[in-house]
Amino acid sequence: MATSCCPAWSVMAKKLFPQFTDYISMALTPMVLTARLQKQKDPSCRIAFIGPCAAKKLEASRRSIRSDVDFVLTFEELQGMFEAKNVRFEDIPKEEEVPLNQGTGAGRGFAVTGGVAGAVVDAIHRMDPDREVKVASAEGLDNCKKMLLLAKAGKYNGYLLEGMACPGGC
């Protein structure tokens, strides 16, 4: 089994290792799932995702996953928009802070290499504390390709594999 929230990793794995396609998790990424849930509440809303990853643009545009995300901006693009409009955050009046609902630490770790696999292992251990779960993770597409080549050679039979295109994660 293989998993990742990284669209670049998923596309690379399916393209270069089509024999693994059926073993790559079809679970929706947090971006897609959040957009889909919001559109169910309000079908007329527009969803914008802002993050570090340009590959999320590809993910949002793929018809095969019906992402429900209308716009994707990278942090760099957003910064460019702020600069073009001379937005200065220090000039914006402060408002009373509204506490956010706390997510689990596992969810916050999805953007880090091995984060999704770590959350899966934690969930398995809550249900079956003695179950052995073997995990292999890689960061950077070259290392991800090496990991999948080793899996193809049978070195990771029974492992949960996770890859991230960017070193360190998103």
Question: For each of these PLM feature ranges, what is it?
Answer:
Residues 1-170:
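Iron-sulfur-associated redox domains of electron-transfer enzymes in respiratory
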